[in-house]
């Protein structure tokens, strides 16, 4: 297959760098301020969007500094696709905001910009599993007011007449897919921000950052210093140059990315309409119309990182050398799908850096370990998402939270393991799978293992299959044989019966599991309980040797965090929460410490690992390996003891996430294996077997136990989440006034438990819940309950649809299935198993 090349690679006007934009050309910028509320560093889409949205949230005294011209980094050479498609509702919502914002900019009579916002786009599929995934994502988008359509191969060809239907089942249609002029977009945002009071300083390089005792900042630049309250890193591929000035490393890596623009194509000139965009996970490319030709971009397997060893300080408005030999395989797939490409001449080749994070999702929010510092970085699809990311970040900065739960974007979701080598491996993997979405329970192999315990190889030898939780390898289930492989799908798969057998073992005898990475913070000092009372919305258990569960709210009265509080000694508490919450919770606690230094915090997350012993024989097994009184009278529910498990020192808590009698055994990592061996040997006579996180997930759904950032979201308050019993309005706590106001206005949604009338697949987080064809809610988590024999889901629904017995429809594989609201916690709802005294 041969492609004709045009002579020369001059840039088309649409692809030119901004040298400078209309807003800067011929104008003298104002003298630089010495003080301001916020300084945004970086003049690409991330910085311009953040600046504009800060003014929209009421902060007019803000500035942006850019080392060169606006859009001179990645933004200027972006292919600039704008789509509604996202992997969760937060991403769909922010992209929908981008589209609405860009449309308003394009319609501004004073400064219109080029935005093709209704060409439509198709994500192709050649397997039924991909089509089922698209149906799920279409269901999820409906809950955000976004309408996708799943279409067959013939309809794909009707809407895009240049494609072949060979090896094609269908695709996902986004009617609002399109593309935008990146330079014009950023200039329009900067223009609106200036009109609202913001200032932009070009050719102003940041040389250092200094944070003061009052937590304010000084931004040192080549044109002078600026004192400010807040600093925002929006530096694109130079993110870690500015990060280093704060003493932090951001897990962001740049990848070389190539596309070319063809000469005019006769079939396009004759079509009479613009061609839709194509995104192809089959052959790893995208293609859209550019003037009267096509723009074809590649995500080749033979890809390259960029800038790992430093970036030329003069690299601006620049590109990397083109290397089309790397993309030969991708080109062959594109030619087969669009034969017209084989006769097209290349007009322009573009190869420039784009940024990726460890999980492919941008880092938007607080900089870990720093106060009054934020970032908006790692935007691999910056033009399409940038409007929404800047919108959410501005809300976080001004109000403390955004209108959506933004944990999927939070920079604190990576807790110390995001080094440069891991980031490079994951960036390569994500680049190679750009259009291949993750299936449920799919954990890709690059950069694994990065966080392990001494038991990881032991459990692997026992047949464990591992999930990844905050970088930690965590046992998901035990494989029946070494060559067992599950088929990743949105349906129930080969693991269904395996997990059921593990649940049965826990229910009828005894099971043992490892919970790696469990977040634990030791709190010591005087007045601990009084301090915690001001943080938790419910009463804090104060008695030594007692364990309690509580919830913290943000200043808006919505759920911030959940934790167990274990009273080890009179002046020593263990705070325990989700593995992913390690940095998040520590920073929240630190931010509210007494100024007198009477209370100290110490992370024990990496020093200990938790074993869970659960089932009716758990107490008997524990009694054989410790001299503690393990009777129900001596060691009842929600108590904590210090002792030994075999020869290993341990902190043992009688708490359960399964609903069965259970003990959390916290062991120092250097003696973890000793404790594990003692339990395995003692358990042999009682039929002990290993069980994993998938069994735990099933059992917690049956018990009505909620997961942080799945069911516990900053969008809802504890009353709406069904946690009213954990709130004590007779005391003061953070968020109380806001909560009182919300309660007086009535619930906006309510969290309910649903029983779904189908057995072939679970629902999944984000799926729509409907009544008479109208979306009235969203699934937060779902799965099969083996002990109750039900297909279960949690969902936030309209308050008048929350009564048990209400009949609804829940989307499963994107299609509505009958469902009914049931009482929460269908397994042992009265906790008789956990409360029994004998």
Which residue ranges define each predicted feature?
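Beta1/beta-strand and adjacent pyrophosphate-binding region of the FAD-binding site
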Residues: 33-46, 63
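Glycine-rich FAD pyrophosphate-binding loop
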Residues: 55-75
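Central beta-strand plus flanking loop segment that forms part of the substrate or channel wall
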Residues: 79-84, 120-123, 248-273, 329, ...
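Dinucleotide-binding Rossmann-like beta1-alpha1 core, especially the glycine-rich loop
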Residues: 79-159, 282-287, 293, 321, ...
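Flavin (FAD/FMN) cofactor-binding and adjacent substrate-gating region
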Residues: 101-104, 125-196, 201-202, 207-215, ...
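C-terminal catalytic lobe of FAD-dependent flavoproteins
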Residues: 282, 318-438, 443-447
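Glycine/proline-enriched, intrinsically flexible loops and inter-domain linkers
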Residues: 404-405, 410-838
């Amino acid at each position: 297959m041969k492609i004709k090349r045009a002579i020369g690679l001059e840039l088309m006007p649409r692809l030119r760098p901004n040298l400078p934009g209309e807003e800067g050309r011929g104008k003298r910028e104002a003298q630089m301020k010495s003080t301001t509320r916020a300084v945004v560093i970086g003049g690409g889409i991330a910085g311009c969007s953040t600046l504009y949205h800060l003014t929209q949230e009421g902060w007019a005294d803000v500035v942006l500094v850019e080392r060169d011209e606006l859009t001179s980094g990645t933004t200027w050479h972006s292919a600039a696709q704008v789509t509604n498609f996202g992997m969760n509702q937060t991403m769909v919502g922010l992209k929908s905001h981008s589209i609405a914002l860009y449309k308003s900019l394009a319609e501004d009579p004073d400064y219109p910009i080029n935005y093709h916002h209704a060409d439509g786009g198709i994500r192709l599929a050649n397997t039924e599993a991909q089509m089922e995934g698209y149906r799920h994502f279409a269901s999820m988008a409906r809950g955000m007011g976004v309408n996708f359509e799943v279409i067959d191969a013939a309809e794909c060809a009707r809407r895009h007449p240049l494609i072949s239907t060979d090896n094609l089942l269908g695709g996902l249609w986004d009617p609002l897919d399109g593309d935008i002029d990146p330079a014009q977009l950023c200039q329009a945002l900067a223009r609106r921000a200036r009109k609202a009071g913001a200032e932009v300083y070009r050719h102003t390089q940041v040389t250092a950052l200094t944070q003061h005792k009052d937590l304010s900042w000084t931004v040192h630049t080549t044109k002078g210093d600026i004192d400010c309250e807040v600093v925002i890193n929006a530096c694109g591929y130079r993110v870690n140059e500015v990060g280093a000035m704060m003493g932090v490393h951001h897990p962001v890596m740049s990848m070389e990315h190539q596309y070319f623009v063809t000469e005019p194509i006769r079939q396009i000139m004759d079509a009479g309409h613009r061609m839709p965009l194509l995104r192809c996970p089959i052959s790893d490319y995208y293609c859209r119309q550019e003037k009267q030709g096509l723009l074809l971009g590649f995500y080749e397997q033979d890809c390259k990182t960029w800038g790992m060893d430093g970036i030329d300080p003069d690299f601006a408005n620049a590109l990397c050398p083109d290397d089309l030999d790397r993309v030969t395989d991708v080109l062959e797939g594109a030619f087969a799908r669009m034969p017209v490409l084989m006769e097209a001449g290349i007009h322009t080749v573009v190869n420039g850096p784009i940024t990726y994070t460890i999980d492919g999702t941008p880092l938007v929010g607080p900089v870990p370990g720093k106060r009054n510092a934020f970032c908006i970085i790692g935007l691999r699809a910056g033009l399409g998402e940038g409007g929404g990311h800047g919108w959410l970040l501005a809300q976080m900065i001004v109000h403390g939270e955004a209108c959506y739960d933004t944990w999927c974007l939070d920079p604190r979701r990576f807790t110390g393991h995001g080094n440069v080598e891991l980031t490079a491996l994951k960036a390569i993997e994500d680049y190679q799978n750009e259009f291949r979405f993750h299936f449920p329970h799919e954990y890709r192999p690059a950069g694994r293992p990065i966080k392990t315990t001494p038991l990881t190889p032991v459990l692997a030898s026992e047949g464990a299959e591992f999930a990844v939780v905050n970088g930690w390898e965590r046992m998901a289930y035990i494989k029946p044989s070494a060559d067992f492989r599950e088929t990743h799908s949105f349906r129930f798969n080969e693991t269904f019966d395996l997990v059921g057998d593990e649940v049965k073992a826990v229910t009828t005898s005894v099971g043992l599991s490892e919970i790696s990475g469990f977040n634990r913070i030791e709190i010591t000092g005087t007045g601990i309980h009084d301090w915690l009372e001001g943080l938790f919305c419910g009463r804090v258990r104060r008695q030594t040797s007692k364990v309690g569960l509580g919830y913290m709210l943000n200043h808006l009265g919505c759920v911030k965090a959940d934790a167990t509080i274990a009273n080890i000694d009179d002046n020593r508490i263990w705070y325990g929460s989700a593995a992913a919450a390690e940095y998040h919770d520590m920073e929240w606690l630190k931010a509210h410490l007494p100024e007198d230094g009477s209370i100290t915090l110490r992370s024990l997350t990496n020093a200990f690992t938790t074993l869970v012993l659960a089932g009716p024989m758990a107490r008997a097994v524990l009694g054989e390996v410790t001299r503690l009184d393990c009777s129900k009278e001596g060691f009842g529910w929600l108590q904590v003891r210090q002792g030994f498990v075999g020869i290993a020192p341990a902190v043992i808590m009688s708490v359960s996430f399964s609903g069965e009698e259970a003990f959390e055994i916290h062991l120092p990592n250097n003696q973890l294996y000793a404790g594990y061996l003692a339990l395995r040997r003692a358990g042999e006579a009682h039929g002990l077997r290993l069980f994993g996180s998938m069994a735990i997930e099933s059992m917690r759904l049956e018990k009505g136990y909620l997961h942080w950032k799945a069911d516990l979201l900053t969008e809802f308050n504890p009353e709406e989440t069904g946690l009213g019993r954990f709130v004590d309005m007779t005391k003061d706590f953070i968020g109380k006034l806001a909560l009182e106001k919300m309660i007086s206005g009535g619930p906006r949604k309510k969290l309910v438990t649903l029983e779904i009338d189908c057995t072939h697949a679970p629902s999944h987080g984000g799926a729509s819940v409907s009544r008479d064809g109208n979306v009235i809610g969203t699934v937060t988590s779902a799965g099969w309950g083996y002990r109750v024999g039900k297909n279960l889901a949690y969902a936030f629904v309209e308050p008048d649809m929350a009564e048990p017995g209400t009949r609804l429809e829940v989307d499963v594989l994107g299609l509505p299935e009958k469902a009914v609201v049931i009482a929460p916690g269908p397994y042992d709802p009265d906790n008789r198993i956990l409360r029994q005294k004998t």
